[in-house]
UniProtKB/Swiss-Prot annotation:
Full protein name: Translationally-controlled tumor protein homolog
Keyword set, alphabetical order: Cytoplasm, Cytoskeleton, Microtubule, Protein biosynthesis
Lineage: Eukaryota, Fungi, Dikarya, Ascomycota, Pezizomycotina
Localization (cell): Cytoplasm, Cytoskeleton
A single BP term in Gene Ontology: translation
Family, per entry: Belongs to the TCTP family.
Gene Ontology terms, MF aspect: calcium ion binding
Gene source species: Aspergillus fumigatus (strain ATCC MYA-4609 / CBS 101355 / FGSC A1100 / Af293)
Length: 179
């Protein structure tokens, strides 16, 4: 299995369990699912036998259910919800992207990434930024669990069918970790 970590924060944000599609040489998109989850639900280890353990049946949460994206749930991403005043304004996000691009470029150079790959990032990023900013109002914005303000924001929108959510991430802002 391959886990993709944000090169700025080190947060795990994606894995090859998702069908990943490269877009314009600089972005990754992957389809997600939304489902109901009990709020504050404890994580159950696969193979664990909860009926053999002591405790009440409602130990996993307070009974209230919330909608979550699978990518959000699996990687403990934090949803910056508009109604809670946490989603950055378009101008603030644009400023973040400008700083983020510089940090990614510096990381790529620091890691000794081939010049051709760095050039591909420099060439493709401006068009991707323009595309993202044009669609910004439609995105749900999520951050890694560390809440590092300099790190990548994971963007979630819906496909043309209006039903299938998909996440958008910066290809060059991720590093692979085989587990």
């Amino acid at each position: 299995m391959i886990i993709y970590k944000d090169i700025i924060s080190g947060d795990e944000v994606l894995s090859d369990n998702f069908k990943i599609k490269e877009v314009d040489g600089v972005l990754y998109e992957c389809d997600c699912r939304k489902y109901l989850k009990r709020k504050n639900e404890d994580i159950q280890l696969e193979g664990a036998n909860p009926s053999a353990e002591e405790g009440d049946d409602d130990a996993g949460g307070d009974g209230e259910e919330v909608m979550v994206h699978d990518i959000e749930d699996q990687f403990r991403l934090v949803w910056l919800k508009t109604e809670e005043g946490m989603k950055p304004s378009k101008d603030a996000f644009k400023s973040h992207l400008k700083t983020y691009m510089k940090k990614v470029l510096a990381k790529l150079q620091e890691k000794g990434v081939p010049e051709a790959e760095i050039d591909a990032f420099k060439k493709g990023a401006p068009a991707a930024v323009k595309k993202i900013l044009a669609n910004y109002d439609n995105y749900d914005v999520l951050m890694g669990h560390s809440m590092d303000g300099d790190a990548m924001h994971v963007l979630i929108d819906f496909r043309e069918d209006g039903v299938t959510p998909y996440a958008t991430l910066w290809k060059h802002g991720l590093e692979e970790m085989k587990v």
